[in-house]
Each structure stands twice: as C-alpha cells, then as structure tokens.
Amino acid sequence: MVDYLIVGAGFSGATIARVLAEKGRRVKIWEQRPHIGGNMYEKTDENGIRNHVYGPHIFHTNSERVFTFLRRFSDFFPYEHRVLGRIDGKLVPIPFNFTSLETLFPAAQAVRLEERLRAAYPEREKISILDLISSGDGEIRSFGDYVFDRVFVHYTAKQWQQPVTEVDASVINRVPVVLGYDDRYFSDRIQAMPADGYTALFERMLDHPNIEVMLSCDALSHLTLRGGRVFLDGEEFSAPVVYTGAPDALLGFCFGHLPYRSLAFVFEQLPIDSFQPAAVVNYPNEEDFTRITESKKLTGQVLPWRTTILREYPAAYSPGAARGGIPYYPVPNAENQALYQRYREILRAYPGLTLCGRLAEYRYCNMDAAVERALDTAEKLAESASAER
C-alpha cells in the first residue's frame, strides 16, 4: 500500500517524492527509463569522464530555497557557463556582446556601434535582438540584422526545422544581446554544478525508506483514466497520482500528438587534453549539428590527455523511434497551446491526478524552476492530505 504514486524520476518527480517521504508518506515512483534523473542523467565512460547523456545541463538560479534544498543531496562547485559561437570563421562569446562585436567588426566601427548602443539603451545591460532589428537608428538596425543573421536565423532553422519568422518570439528572446563585456551565458546569482554529478544527487535524493523506485516501468501500460477515476491494472486506485509525463500520451493521443522537437547525440572519445576552449561551442550556420559539448569542462574533472565530446543534432520528434524518440522541447505557438489546453481540460476532471513538470505542463522549464514548482506542489499535496484526515 502506498500513499502516493509518482510517474517519472526527473527533478519534478524526485523532488515531490522526497518532500512527501520526509512527511511520513509512502511513495512509489514508476520510471519509464532504466535510470533515474530524467534528462539530467550522467554516465561515466571508458575515459572516466561523466557525460551528460541528454545534453549539457548547467544549474543556475536566483532561488535560495531551491539551492538550499539541492545542497542537502550534493556539494556544489562554482561554475559560470561560457559559450562560444563560430561566426565568420571566428569563435566569439554567445550571447553576442561587445567582445563579439570587437572581434567581428573593424575597430572604428565597433567603437562607434558601442557608443550608439549605450546611448540608445542607457539603462539596459541586455537587449532583445528583436528590439535591435526594429530600432529607429539605421546603424543599430544594421548591426541587429547582422547578429540576427549570423546567430539566430540558421541556428533557429536547424533547431526548430522552421524559418525563424515562424518561430515564437519567446524562443528568440531567450538569448539576448549583451551591452557590455559580460561573457557568462547566465546572469543568475547562484551558478554551480553538483560536485559528483547529477546522477549521484538523484541517488541521494531518492534514498529514503519511504521511497520505492521501479525502473523500466511503463506507467501507461498500467494506468487507465475513466469517468473521473484512476484505475491501476483494472482496479480503482484511490491514492493520489503525480504525473510528470506527456498528457497526450496519458489520454491515448485522442486529440493528436502535442508537437515537440527532439535531439540526437554523437559521442566521441579523443586522446587529447582539450578539444575546444569552452565547454560548449555553438555552430549556428553551415554545420548540420548545433553545438559541441566537451564533457569534462562541465564536470570539473581533471583527466589529462583524454576527453569526450558530444555533437548535438536537432531531430524531428517521433515517439518510440531510436533517433528522435525523446521529447525535449515543446513547440511554442498558440495552436499547440490550445491543443494542450484541450488535454488539460479533460484531466481536470480527475481530482486524484496532479500534473507537474515540463512535459506534463507542456512548457520550457529550467531545472531550478522545475524544482521550485515541485516543492510547491509537494507542499500542497501534503496540506490537502492533512486536511482530509
């Protein structure tokens, strides 16, 4: 007998499980994959290097609450993420900043542009590329067009398989232009990485006598929703269910598939000390991959004359396929959000079912936001259970 069933052992499911377990609740987790940690899962290769199997995940937050919670399960070391992009044959900081500008433009033109940008946006440290390309200043607008073309147009087309003009503005605005020399990818007050990796962090988080984890368990082969009630292997299930997976799959895709973009990764082990000058280098233009990550530059491991890189290729999402079978990014637009709301409306009729997480809520979500939302959800679940007793 369990008090809660949680589907998914990523940050959302694991956080909720831990909070409820510490309140004396018995929790069972069903995880579809053969490992915990969701897309944060790390695996050590023959080089002894921990690889982010599902692409680079860098922790950053302004929430002391989230960081305090996670530090219970891992030490962290300071890490400020810096990304370079190959533009016109040169490596420059991404987001595009004044160093990028001075590297790619003639000196006199660079100085003049910096002065005009500071004068036009005196109170701003960052500016959206969409603001630059719509500027009333012709020189600023021309600069914006250059950055838009070199940094956004082709990268976005590769990532989303759509022309940049058809991609939601929220996607474009995730990467600003920096009006200064700050070359950090994130500006959050807290930027750090778990000292011995995300997998170890999840192992400790889920190590509690009130938590049972079942791996390689397809919840959808056991759960059925009917008439506002949840059934488990044909029997009505009265305990609350927290679902962190895709809602369209939960309802048998009755309205069709929610669109996602997927990724494919190619790992390569090399007998060299260093492959590239930054942990991540973006390739926004000619190449068919979008970026290369050098794993040990993320993990902080000191392993001379061996390194592992991963090339990241965007892919169409095809459920269950060997390539592109994992949903990574929801495709944000009004039509897709309306489709999600149709699924959400049906699921509201199930009071024992709680949706939590980036897949369940069909939204792009940083790790810290996922943890914060999970902490809030766990507290509400516990309060609701206490009120019913």
What are these regions (language model features)?
Residues D88-V92, F98-A239:
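Active-site/ligand-binding neighborhood in enzyme catalytic cores
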Residues A21-E46:
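Glycine-rich FAD pyrophosphate-binding loop
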Residues N47-A120:
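Dinucleotide-binding Rossmann-like beta1-alpha1 core, especially the glycine-rich loop
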Residues I6-V7, W30, E235-D248:
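Short hydrophobic core segments
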Residues R26, R50, D75, N210-E212:
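Conserved beta-strand segments of alpha/beta enzyme cores
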Residues R18, E22, E42, D207, ...:
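Short, well-ordered alpha-helices that flank and scaffold nucleotide-derived cofactor binding pockets
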Residues A239-P240, D248-A387:
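C-terminal segments that line or cap access tunnels to active or ligand-binding sites in enzymes
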Residues V2-I29, A378:
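N-terminal Rossmann-like FAD-binding beta1-loop-alpha1 element of flavoenzymes
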